[in-house]
């Protein structure tokens, strides 16, 4: 990069060398940061210059998957008020490329990150829709009348394609048949409900994850339907009436991001933004100090401190999701927290025009172990006439947990259709 101005005069370097932050915990935010034109808060940037001719900038947790990116030897163009600069950069861990443009004056840094292209964006960045259910002949385990012997048989009417993807390598045994039954049942149930909640998912080239979703009440969900899916395969005709009149709205940016690492797609939730959104959307007065402390604890990866503060916060909010989180045991909370804050590692494969984004056995095992603890959250999401089914739901989740932990190979996630 070459500076467009060879005159290097400007403020004294010591006056602009500082850490600039717009974190909520900073009482005097001095960083104006935009990410592809959208304001980005809760971040910090180091800026330093010794001579006023070149600078070093360190970006902290701004690019998805990059804890810190240090850019050196940045040419500065100075004037009486400050220094301007621009250039191109690349992530150390994710191979993300980007452009940066900024200006620093005494007490203020303005920085725009643009032209962001995540590593593997050419392969994965796209808008994905849910597929229609396709039924046909599939080889499945079938038991004899007494359940003493199981054989592989080709059976018509089975689910070949659906929005929930499930595959497990099982043996022709009672255990294998149990895993198959639970797996097919969950695939049916999730694929039945998911189209009512989700229309499409977008993995942006800039790392943002957004979706078109519906918050209308669920239709056609009752106990007979749910348990019927353990025996009866799902069909598209069961789904279509429930989604015909649903309205879908776009989700905001900033709640989830993606990046690639070691060939896997890592999905990461922005807990700080999510917690701030829950608090700001509540009509109840929130102590800003608690919100700030939670966000700081999240950034410091202090799971138990986060749980303690969320417990205090939810005494005012009475939010069902937060209530579930703070009531799980410490071991489960630690697992959930670490999983969400470090990112969810997912495999991506493509076949016959469909894209499969899923967890393998290693990625899914922590979730399978947590399933029994999810019962209160699942029950809270069910229609009012199903709220008394806590015991049955608990039994259901325990069965799934045991069945999904037994196979050597298991794949569980989404089957999607890319727009292009």
Where are these regions (language model features)?
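Hydrophilic extracytoplasmic domains
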Residues: 235-236, 244-256, 262-264, 271, ...
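Bacterial Sec-dependent N-terminal signal peptides
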Residues: 1-26, 107-128, 132, 403-420
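Short beta-strand edge/turn micro-motifs at domain boundaries
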Residues: 127-131, 146, 269-270, 357-359
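Short, solvent-exposed coil/turn segments at beta-strand boundaries
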Residues: 50-55, 79-82, 101-110, 201-210, ...
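Broad, structure-driven detector of short, well-ordered beta-strand segments within folded domains
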Residues: 44-48, 99-104, 194-207, 344-348, ...
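N-terminal glycine/threonine-rich, aromatic-flanked beta-hairpin/loop signature
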Residues: 37-72, 142-293
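Extended, solvent-exposed, non-transmembrane regions
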Residues: 13-77, 86-123, 139, 146
């Amino acid at each position: 990069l070459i500076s467009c101005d060879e005159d290097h005069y400007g403020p004294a370097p010591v006056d602009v060398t500082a850490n600039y932050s717009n974190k909520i915990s900073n009482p005097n935010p001095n960083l104006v940061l935009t990410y592809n034109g959208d304001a980005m808060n809760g971040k910090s940037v180091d800026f330093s210059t010794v001579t006023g001719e070149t600078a070093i900038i360190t970006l902290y947790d701004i690019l998805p998957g990059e804890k810190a990116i240090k850019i050196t030897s940045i040419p500065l163009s100075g004037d009486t008020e400050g220094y301007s600069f621009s250039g191109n950069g690349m992530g150390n861990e994710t191979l993300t490329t980007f452009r940066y443009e900024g200006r620093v004056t005494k007490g203020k840094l303005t920085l725009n990150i643009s032209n962001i292209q995540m590593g593997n964006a050419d392969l994965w960045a796209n808008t994905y829709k849910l597929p229609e259910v396709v039924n046909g002949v599939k080889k499945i385990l079938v038991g004899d009348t007494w359940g003493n012997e199981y054989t592989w048989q080709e059976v018509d009417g089975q689910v070949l394609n659906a929005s929930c993807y499930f595959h497990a390598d099982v043996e022709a045994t009672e255990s294998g048949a149990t895993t198959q039954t639970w797996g097919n049942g969950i695939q049916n149930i999730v694929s039945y409900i998911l189209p009512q909640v989700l229309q499409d998912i977008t993995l942006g080239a800039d790392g943002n994850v957004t979706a078109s979703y519906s918050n209308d009440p669920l239709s056609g969900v009752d106990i007979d339907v749910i348990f019927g899916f353990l025996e009866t395969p799902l069909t598209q005709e069961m789904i279509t009436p429930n989604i015909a009149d649903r309205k879908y709205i776009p989700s905001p940016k900033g709640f989830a991001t993606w990046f690639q690492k070691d060939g896997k797609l890592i999905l990461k939730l922005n807990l700080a933004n999510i917690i701030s959104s829950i608090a700001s959307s509540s009509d109840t007065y929130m102590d800003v100090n608690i919100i700030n402390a939670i966000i700081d604890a999240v950034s410091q990866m202090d799971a138990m401190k986060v749980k303690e503060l969320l417990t205090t916060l939810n005494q005012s909010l009475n939010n069902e999701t937060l209530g579930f989180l703070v009531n799980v045991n410490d071991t489960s909370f630690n697992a959930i927290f670490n999983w969400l804050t470090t990112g969810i590692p997912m495999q991506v494969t493509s076949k016959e025009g469909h894209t499969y984004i899923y967890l393998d056995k290693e990625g899914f095992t922590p979730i399978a172990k947590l399933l029994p603890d999810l019962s209160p959250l699942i029950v809270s999401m069910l229609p009012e006439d199903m709220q008394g089914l806590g015991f049955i739901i608990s039994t259901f989740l325990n069965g799934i947990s045991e069945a999904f932990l037994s196979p050597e190979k298991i794949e569980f996630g989404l089957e999607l259709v890319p727009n292009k």
